[in-house]
């Protein structure tokens, strides 16, 4: 149901999906090692359900464990699963989390107040999210984010991501593919 342009409720529900996130350490293999060693901005892509959030969480943990300050924009609580102020997932010792706040606002607040070296954002999908990522990069902060796409060509077809590509916000793209139930991770460099 929509009231005043906002979703206010649901009715005639035919199904419910309950997503149960889990920690998966060391996923991504060599690609994860390259991302931890590099200082580049990275966009992680795959279709829905492809493992983007799980891989991003592992990137956060690995980078933070190396002594780098990571600010996590966890709008829906999927990255850190914060409960009473404590992350329920291991996101590393140098991570701070802002949860239940729109990513675009959280990124700018974290940028101003937490002195991050890296900002992590899951499922950037709006012009505001893209502008926040570009602002962070413009301030010298590394950004690692996820987006729904099967390939770079998909990003180029969508207006919201064309801005990021035109502004050279991301240097690298990690493409996650699922072949017969086995995930593979490929790192592509943007020119």
Feature map (PLM): residue ranges:
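The conserved Walker
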Residues: 48-49
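Hydrophobic anchor at the beta1->P-loop junction of P-loop NTPases
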Residues: 44
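Conserved P-loop NTPase
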Residues: 2-12, 171-191
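P-loop NTPase switch/communication element
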Residues: 36, 63-110
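P-loop NTP-binding catalytic core
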Residues: 1-40
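Conserved P-loop NTPase nucleotide-binding/switch module
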Residues: 114-174, 178
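Hydrophobic positions on the alpha1 helix immediately C-terminal to the Walker A/P-loop
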Residues: 55, 59
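Conserved lysine of the Walker
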Residues: 52
């Amino acid at each position: 149901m929509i009231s005043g342009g906002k979703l206010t409720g649901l009715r005639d529900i035919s199904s419910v999906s309950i997503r149960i996130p889990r920690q998966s350490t060391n996923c991504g293999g060599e690609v994860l090692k390259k991302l931890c060693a590099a200082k580049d901005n990275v966009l992680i892509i795959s279709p829905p359900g492809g493992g983007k959030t799980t891989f991003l969480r592992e990137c956060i943990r690995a980078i933070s464990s190396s002594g780098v300050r990571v600010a996590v924009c966890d709008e829906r609580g999927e990255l850190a699963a914060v409960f009473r102020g404590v992350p329920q997932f291991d996101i590393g010792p140098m991570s701070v989390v802002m949860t239940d706040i729109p990513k675009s606002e959280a990124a700018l607040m974290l940028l101003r107040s937490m002195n991050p070296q890296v900002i992590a954002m899951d499922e950037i999908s709006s012009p505001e999210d893209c502008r926040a990522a570009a602002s962070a990069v413009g301030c010298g902060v590394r950004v690692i984010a996820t987006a729904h796409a099967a390939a770079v060509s998909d990003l180029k077809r969508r207006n919201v991501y064309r801005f990021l590509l035109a502004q050279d916000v991301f240097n690298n793209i990690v493409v996650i593919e699922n072949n017969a139930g086995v995930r593979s991770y490929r790192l592509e460099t943007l020119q």
